[in-house]
Curated annotation (Swiss-Prot):
The gene is rpoB. This is DNA-directed RNA polymerase subunit beta. One of its GO terms (molecular function) is ribonucleoside binding. Belongs to the RNA polymerase beta chain family. It comes from Citrobacter koseri (strain ATCC BAA-895 / CDC 4225-83 / SGSC4696). It catalyses: RNA(n) + a ribonucleoside 5'-triphosphate = RNA(n+1) + diphosphate. Keywords: DNA-directed RNA polymerase, Nucleotidyltransferase, Transcription, Transferase. Coiled coil: none annotated. HAMAP family: RNApol_bact_RpoB (MF_01321). One of its GO terms (cellular component) is DNA-directed RNA polymerase complex. The RNAP catalytic core consists of 2 alpha, 1 beta, 1 beta' and 1 omega subunit. When a sigma factor is associated with the core the holoenzyme is formed, which can initiate transcription. NCBIfam families: PRK00405.1, rpoB. Pfam families: RNA_pol_Rpb2_1 (PF04563), RNA_pol_Rpb2_2 (PF04561), RNA_pol_Rpb2_3 (PF04565), RNA_pol_Rpb2_45 (PF10385), RNA_pol_Rpb2_6 (PF00562), RNA_pol_Rpb2_7 (PF04560).
Length: 1342
């Protein structure tokens, strides 16, 4: 296996057996590809902005004399880059400019004669852009648009499963769902009549819609029924015989022909009878006259002579009618073929209850149902019906919908129109009737073939289209009204509705969510999330059990494990590792093709529908070297069921064992040994891990850590290979390899690192270089670690030495006992950054002012502020300290003009302003690490703002000039090379100043050309530098665009360092969570024979009942990994020769049966081996992939290699007494996470504080500085104990007795502890409520 330079530094030993056929795809592609499709020019006009424009334009005027046509669009450049947008609190977006053409036609001339054409580029608002990591910056905060799983457009056949009607009869229904437009439902009622509903309105007989489509009763019956033909010959009734139709019926008369009786009266007609009739080719049989009674005529019969209607279509025949028909000369009578078994008379019955009899009455009926109360006119009724399903503006099935529609009706072509046709509606009704007749199955709506993914691009396109449609109306008005000769396209278009629609979607849609930025994993998971909620989706309350459940089609597409606990369970899912969406938006997953029993490396992506036709083997099926299955019978999946198949029946095989699970679940080692519920908690809790001060890679991982760290975008990754030319804490410079350079560039890549920034969850984002000077790097190498990454691998927690044993009740109920050493070594210390903002507004009484001159505040409180009234950077502040001094004018007193004059002269200010400074919230203390001041355009900047500006300018200049120097150096080294090769002596050249080099001339023409080219590049470089510097200066010095009424905003950033402490929540990766109960001194912790104390003591009772055994295997394997690290450490300390070191490390890597990873340390130089050993000192990292991990035997071998007991248990001694514990204890290394549920954020106490206005009771909750609720049940408890005085105190002075509590406060201050309870305010509220009912209730003094 080839390792890149960074990977060589620390290779993870892989226990995976199955070869990696397909690399893990880029994990954010679902977001990036979708948005790319939205903004990129699409000549076909299928997707994105192009599709939206084409669907709305051209817009014609009502008269048809003019139209506005769309030509093309372009997106401009964003004004600010992503970081600037975040700092300034603006949206990262680009202006959209559209080229439109206004065409005016001649009025009198023949149609299509053009009078005038005007073309112009029009601004159409801003389109938010996606950052490289798949997020959007909206108003300065990073947001993610979650993909939605919604019901695919098309037609669905379903049943109520017998739940609607009391008889338990199953009622079938069909529903045509368009991408946009009205829903059309057909449904049976318990009497087997067929009804139609439009948009879930009142139901109408289904034949009304057929009549509205211009069908007559005869045509309707013709469409849905076969005919039975009777002929009257010689006063006898004969019936044309179709033997197949008789099957299963009981003969009501002898069936005979040519003197032979085939079936006797009363006998059941069987397949044998039918075969005989067919064999003898019987075409007609004689039937008794009574047999026709009750049959239904299929068409109108008219008396030719008189023109009188004897029998109408769909009328039941009787013997009288038969006689009349016979008399009027009708000898051939057509009736409908129905029976109770599989040809029900549903449509015939429906026609009977249909009140309409022609097209107009049907349209009127539909109009009345859609618009009750409006008087119908013929035109209104016709246009309403036309617009419902047959107008492209109002109705669209979309390509997906048409494909699903045609597939469902078993048509051959999958393309077609987006609107419905007559045939579409009739075919749906026919299929529904077939299902009712017992032919065909209903659809499964939870099948992933019937649900599709709607991603960012598509949702943004829909919103954009909504905006365009709003504009369309206005444009139509203007085209009809105005004087067109003077108007230009930009006078027609108002960009407001478009930007409003887009802004609303990105800012406040249910699917546009505040990004979860706790750690890199939570970012990636959030972007790969799939929600069934949101506009056009389900709601929590309505979603039943079936929708939430795991479906067989989820395999390899949606993770069966990772979903929230609580009301959203199963509605919010996570995409599986290898899943992707196809062109229609259905999820598909990769499989290896199996040809002639040989598994090939050919990969096919199959959607849920396609998968149903194949037999698919599991990824853990054993193969020989040629790729044949070893076993005769292979475990496979087919049509949603799992069973054994012979090896030559197999069509496909899974790509990887982790194909089933999501990224979060694929990071849990030994997932196969955990109960699913606990694995769910484990996957969810990894997302809540707070990045620790020093990241520590997991000793036991799954091999997915690198993919997650790199794809999440928190690390700095090399764009091109080269060598590290410069590196410090905030920037890395790479000199690019010759072969990767673009022609004519300096070949220098500069990576600026992010330093101590705040994430959405107030955790700290900080990048640190992990390469050193002169190191070679390749494309894709990790150059700098971000939060929670260690040498390019995801590192959410810390490796802890744990023991499973009870310890004095301190680990009762999942509590965790932690050693003091963990605190001392800052293992779980985290940095949290809080942003506090102070806004100075323009009020009615005058502007608020940011100043250090605050009334009634002592010197001490102002000691940390500068002269502008803003806190210094580096100040240590605690709760209640002033960060930004601000005063607000207060205007209770109306001043006389004389007073005003005096005020103006003497500037007596303090009396009319109140202190509204920004203070540190209670319970928070930290260090100020940054201050930003934003000043409105046109408002004078204060001293601090100017200082900050100057600093930023200086920094920008320094950055740019350093960049220029680096690029210049690169360029001059190339100039040097050209000059030397052109014959100039190197020594002389070095004596010349660099800028004079370009003045030299060379005789060789080719070299001279090269030199001139380089000189041009040099000039361009300087010019570019000036331009960049000017742009930066302009951005820094220009005023800020603040909200109306805001003059200034000061943002202060506090860094809070939080050590681990009792009450903090910790967890492993297997759903084993607990709260720290005690931090124990090191000397009291249990220790082993070598005197090494354990770090954490966990309760063994937390394992068996929860069935997450993965944690125990992880503990053992972690111990082995650490043991090997210890041996390497000892060898390094003894300075043993490299050969021995190489041999031992090689043995460790080779251990384990037929593992896929072959590490050959002989290809490593001695230096590389030493560096590797240095990085393995703390333990050899191990990968045990999901469902393909280390076996028990392999763990034992590894323990043996590390000189550790293979039982995984050791003898421990009690730290307090030094006595040995009576049994050996499982001790090992487990990866523990500190979760973002910190006790500091939850601890809260109140003495006095704010009260609710109406009830005068204290508020509740930490945010309001509220009290503890003493509720109804607590009152009962005091009553039960008879604690009368305590109860009285609780209900009066401690709560809402206003006078009593004020007096009480005074008494306590005076040292007098007497209590005088009065009337609780809530009693007055009760009185008022009773009075509001009109009952006068008064309190009388006795």
């Amino acid at each position: 296996m080839v390792y890149s330079y960074t990977e060589k530094k620390r290779i993870r030993k892989d226990f995976g057996k199955r070869p990696q056929v397909l690399d893990v795809p880029y994990l954010l592609s679902i977001q990036l590809d979708s948005f790319q499709k939205f903004i990129e020019q699409d000549p076909e006009g299928q997707y994105g902005l192009e599709a939206a424009f084409r669907s709305v334009f051209p817009i014609q005027s009502y008269s048809g004399n003019s139209e506005l046509q769309y030509v093309s669009y372009r997106l401009g450049e964003p004004v600010f880059d992503v970081q600037e947008c975040q700092i300034r609190g603006v949206t990262y977006s680009a202006p959209l400019r559209v080229k439109l053409r206004l065409v005016i036609y001649e009025r009198e001339a023949p149609e299509g004669t053009v009078k005038d054409i005007k073309e112009q580029e029009v601004y159409m608002g801003e389109i938010p852009l996606m950052t490289d990591n798949g997020t959007f910056v909206i108003n300065g905060t990073e947001r993610v648009i979650v993909s939605q799983l919604h019901r695919s457009p098309g037609v669905f056949f379903d049943s109520d499963k017998g739940k609607t009607h009391s008889s338990g009869k199953v009622l079938y229904n069909a529903r045509i769902i368009p991408y946009r437009g009205s829903w059309l439902d057909f449904e049976f009622d318990p009497k087997d009549n067929l009804f139609v509903r439009i948009d879930r309105r009142r139901k109408l007989p289904a034949t009304i819609i057929l009549r509205a489509l211009q069908y007559t009763t005869e045509q309707i019956l013709d469409l849905f029924f076969e005919k039975v033909i009777f002929e009257i010959r010689d006063n006898k009734l004969q019936m044309e015989l179709v033997p197949e139709r008789l099957r299963g019926e009981t003969a009501s008369f002898d069936i005979e022909a040519n003197g032979k009786v085939y079936v006797e009266k009363g006998r059941r007609i069987t397949a044998r009878h039918i075969r005989q009739l067919e064999k003898d080719d019987i075409k007609h049989i004689e039937v008794p006259v009574e047999y026709i009674a009750g049959k239904v005529a299929s068409k109108d019969y008219v008396d030719e002579s008189t023109g009188e209607l004897i029998c109408a279509a769909n009328m039941e025949l009787s013997l009288d009618l038969l006689a009349k028909l016979s008399q009027s000369g009708h000898k051939r009578i057509e009736t409908l073929f129905t029976n109770d078994l599989d040809h029900g008379p549903y449509i015939s019955e429906t026609v009977r209850i249909d009140p309409t009899n022609d097209r107009l009455s049907a349209l009127v009926e539909i109009y009345r149902m859609m618009r009750p109360g409006e008087p119908p006119t013929r035109e209104a009724a016709e246009s309403l019906f036309e617009n419902l399903f047959f107008s492209e503006d109002r109705y669209d099935l979309s390509a997906v919908g048409r494909m699903k529609f045609n597939r469902s009706l078993l048509r051959d072509e999958i393309e077609g129109s987006g609107i419905l046709s007559k045939d579409d509606i009739i075919d749906v009704m026919k299929k529904l009737i077939d299902i009712r007749n017992g032919k065909g199955e209903v659809d499964d709506i939870d099948h992933l073939g019937n649900r599709r993914i709607r991603s960012v691009g598509e949702m943004a396109e829909n919103q954009f289209r909504v905006g365009l449609v709003r504009v369309e109306r206005a444009v139509k008005e203007r085209l009809s009204l105005g004087d067109l000769d003077t108007l230009m396209p930009q006078d027609m278009i108002n960009a407001k509705p478009i930007s409003a629609a887009v802004k609303e979607f990105f800012g406040s849609s249910q699917l546009s969510q505040f990004m979860d930025q706790n750690n890199p994993l939570s970012e990636i998971t959030h972007k790969r999330r799939i929600s069934a909620l949101g506009p056009g989706g389900l709601t929590r309350e309505r979603a039943g059990f079936e929708v939430r459940d795991v479906h067989p089609t989820h395999y390899g597409r949606v993770c069966p494990i990772e979903t929230p606990e609580g009301p959203n369970i199963g509605l919010i899912n996570s995409l599986s590792v290898y899943a992707q969406t196809n062109e229609y938006g259905f999820l598909e997953t990769p499989y290896r093709k199996v040809t002639d029993g040989v598994v090939t490396d050919e990969i096919h992506y199959l959607s849920a529908i396609e998968e149903g036709n194949y037999v698919i083997a599991q990824a853990n099926s054993n193969l020989d070297d040629e790729g044949h299955f070893v076993e005769d019978l292979v475990t496979c999946r087919s049509k949603g069921e799992s069973s054994l198949f012979s090896r030559d029946q197999v069509d496909y095989m899974d790509v990887s064992t982790q194909q089933v699970v999501s990224v979060g679940a694929s990071l849990i080692p030994f997932l196969e040994h955990d109960d699913a519920n606990r694995a769910l908690m484990g996957a969810n809790m990894q997302r809540q891990a707070v990045p620790t001060l020093r990241a520590d890679k997991p000793l036991v991982g799954t091999g997915m850590e690198r993919a997650v760290a790199v794809d999440s975008g928190v690390t700095a990754v090399a764009k091109r290979g080269g060598t590290v030319q410069y590196v410090d804490a905030s920037r890395i410079v790479i000199k690019v390899n010759e072969d990767e350079m673009y022609p004519g560039e300096a070949g220098i890549d500069i990576y600026n690192l992010t330093k101590y920034t705040r994430s959405n969850q107030n955790t700290c984002i900080n990048q640190m270089p992990c390469v050193s000077l002169g190191e070679p790097v390749e494309r894709g190498d990790v150059l700098a670690d971000g939060p929670s990454t260690d040498l390019g691998e995801l590192a959410l927690g810390q490796n802890m030495r744990v023991a499973f044993m009870p310890w004095n009740g301190y680990n009762f109920e999942d509590s965790i006992l932690v050693s003091e050493r963990v605190v001392q070594e800052d293992r779980f210390t985290t940095i949290h950054i809080q942003e506090l903002a102070c806004v100075s507004r323009d009020t009615k009484l005058g502007p608020e002012e940011i100043t250090a001159d605050i009334p009634n505040v002592g010197e001490a409180a102002l000691s940390k502020l500068d002269e502008s009234g803003i806190v210094y950077i580096g100040a240590e502040v605690t709760g209640g300290d002033i960060l930004v001094g601000k005063v607000t004018p207060k205007g209770e007193t109306q001043l006389t003009p004389e007073e005003k004059l005096l005020r103006a002269i003497f500037g007596e200010k303090a009396s009319d302003v109140k202190d509204s400074s920004l203070r540190v919230p209670n319970g928070v203390s930290g260090t100020v690490i940054d201050v930003q001041v934003f000043t409105r355009d046109g408002v004078e900047k204060d001293k601090r703002a100017l200082e900050i500006e100057e600093m930023q300018l200086k920094q920008a200049k320094k950055d740019l000039s350093e960049e220029l120097q680096i690029l210049e150096a690169g360029l001059f080294s190339r100039i040097h090379a050209v000059l030397v090769s052109g014959g100039v002596e190197a020594e002389k050249l070095d004596k010349l100043p660099r800028d004079r080099w370009l003045e030299l001339g060379l005789t060789d023409e080719e070299k001279q050309n090269q030199l001139e080219q380089l000189a041009e590049q040099y000039d361009e470089l300087k010019h570019e530098f000036e331009k960049k510097l000017e742009a930066k200066r302009r951005k820094i010095t220009q005023g800020d665009d603040l909200a109306p009424g805001v003059l200034k905003i000061v943002k202060v950033y506090l860094a809070v360092k939080r050590r681990i402490q009792p009450g903090d929540k910790m967890a492993g990766r297997h759903g084993n969570k607990g709260v720290i109960s005690k931090i124990n001194p090191i000397e009291d912790m249990p220790y082993d024979e070598n005197g090494t104390p354990v770090d954490i003591v966990l309760n063994p009772l937390g394992v068996p009942s929860r069935m997450n055994i993965g944690q125990i295997l992880e503990t053992h394997l972690g111990m082995a990994a650490k043991g090997i690290g210890d041996k390497i450490n000892a060898m390094l300390k003894q300075q043993q020769e490299v050969a021995k070191l190489r041999e031992f490390i090689q043995r460790a890597y080779d251990l384990g049966a037929d593992v896929r990873q072959k590490v050959d340390l002989n290809t490593f130089s001695d230096e590389e081996v030493l560096r590797l050993a240095e990085n393995l000192r703390k333990g050899m990292p191990i990968a045990t992939p999901v469902f393909d991990g280390a076996k028990e035997a392999e763990i034992k071998e590894l323990l043996k290699l590390g000189d550790l007991p293979t039982s995984g248990q050791i003898t421990l001694f009690d730290g307090r007494t030094g006595e040995q514990f009576e049994r050996s204890v499982t001790v090992g290394y487990m990866y523990m996470l500190k979760l973002n549920h910190l006790v500091d954020d939850k601890m809260h106490a109140r003495s006095t504080g704010s009260y609710s206005l109406v009830t005068q009771q204290p508020l509740g909750g930490k945010a309001q500085f509220g009290g503890q609720r003493f509720g109804e049940m607590e009152v009962w408890a005091l009553e039960a104990y008879g604690a009368a005085y305590t109860l009285q105190e609780m209900l009066t002075v401690k709560s809402d007795d206003v006078n009593g509590r004020t007096k009480m406060y005074k008494n306590i201050v005076d040292g007098n502890h007497q209590m005088e309870p009065g009337m609780p305010e809530s009693f007055n509220v009760l009185l008022k409520e009773i009075r509001s009912l009109g009952i006068n209730i008064e309190l009388e003094d006795e």
